[in-house]
């Protein structure tokens, strides 16, 4: 919104700063962190009073988790406030990619909020119906992908079918055009990302730091993909307008830092599905917008690993009646093996950093 003040730069030269994505990204990061820091304590106290027993703890989980009973959930409200507030101030709201990303952020956050509400009120892990939840997620994601696809098709910078095509790392000109089915593919990517982060969110600080790492990585990708000079130099696909997504991701990082202040062990609050679905959906949307869906599987490899562990566990158990892991998602498996919570969290952070660097390296390998 503040970018519109650039029109007054003829009279106030300092307003030229608002033209620069890098400046507004830093400002969004600072603003979102400040929002969470300022309003976090009030939100936490309000949720603690309203929720009473807080998030239900799994009876079959590690014994160390029972001491977390009574910790409030829905901390994603703090994160959403930071992201949306900072984005409204610093991002270009006339940009289709920004609007589509915020649509997914808020839509997935609302789904997660309802799921958290059901779990808290029923004191059960069974919240929103799985099929209904996925269906609504696909509708929201599909709408966002459709409008982003139309925008990319209209730009015509890389051919008439670029907007509906899948791009591959290492090969700039190797594209597979899916036509209208790209909406389905993009929706799958966004929904998958949202639920992958949701599965990862099981320990204090485990999900939020890898999310910030992924957000920083995709902030770089969005900035480069949206800049014709850098895109041509690196031989990556130029997608006009996606550079503005760096501002939104700056807000994600700032909100994540603010939330981590309260989520550091022992956590004063959990983000819940409200936060994890929204954050994962946001990252997934940026990946689709910048044509780096496959690279997201590398940068977000930790989330992929967590998701695969659940799929393998459930599938193998249905076929044989036995389990591959002591408990899924896989971070609980390592807890059962004797790792402390801090060991699991920090080691998974290290994995996330390594995968992010590996994913970013694909930008130069052409």
Swiss-Prot record:
Reaction(s) the record says it catalyses: UDP-N-acetyl-alpha-D-muramoyl-L-alanyl-gamma-D-glutamyl-meso-2,6-diaminopimeloyl-D-alanyl-D-alanine + di-trans,octa-cis-undecaprenyl phosphate = di-trans,octa-cis-undecaprenyl diphospho-N-acetyl-alpha-D-muramoyl-L-alanyl-D-glutamyl-meso-2,6-diaminopimeloyl-D-alanyl-D-alanine + UMP
Subcellular localization: Cell inner membrane
Main subcellular location: membrane
A Pfam family hit: Glycos_transf_4
Transmembrane segments: 27-47, 71-91, 93-113, 134-154, 174-194, 205-225, 245-265, 268-288, 294-314, 343-363
Known EC number: 2.7.8.13
Pathway: Cell wall biogenesis; peptidoglycan biosynthesis
Stored InterPro entries: Glycosyl_transferase_4 (IPR000715), PNAcMuramoyl-5peptid_Trfase (IPR003524), PNAcMuramoyl-5peptid_Trfase_CS (IPR018480)
Alphabetized HAMAP family for the sequence: MraY
Listed name of the protein: Phospho-N-acetylmuramoyl-pentapeptide-transferase
Organism: Rhizobium etli (strain CIAT 652)
